[in-house]
């Protein structure tokens, strides 16, 4: 999602492939996959981020997600 990252593409792609394999194994629908991704994000924010920073980080995360979407241009 971010343009620059302290993590390598290889690190991210490896974990993404493993998570994708688990979702595929369970035949997770797009809706279930998004629900799981949202729950993971919520749990990380609530358990690993200071309460004073949660909203700011959640807003930045949401904006990065929106920015990364491939949306067709209207004519």
Swiss-Prot record:
InterPro entries: UPF0352, YejL_sf. It comes from the Bacteria. Disulfide bonds: none annotated. Belongs to the UPF0352 family. This is UPF0352 protein VIBHAR_03027.
């Amino acid at each position: 999602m971010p343009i620059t990252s302290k993590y390598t593409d290889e690190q991210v792609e490896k974990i993404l492939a493993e998570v994708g394999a688990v979702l595929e194994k369970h035949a997770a629908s797009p809706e279930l996959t998004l629900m799981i991704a949202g729950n993971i994000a919520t749990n990380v924010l609530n358990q690993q981020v200071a309460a004073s920073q949660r909203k700011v980080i959640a807003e930045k995360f949401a904006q990065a997600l929106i920015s990364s979407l491939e949306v067709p241009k209207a004519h």
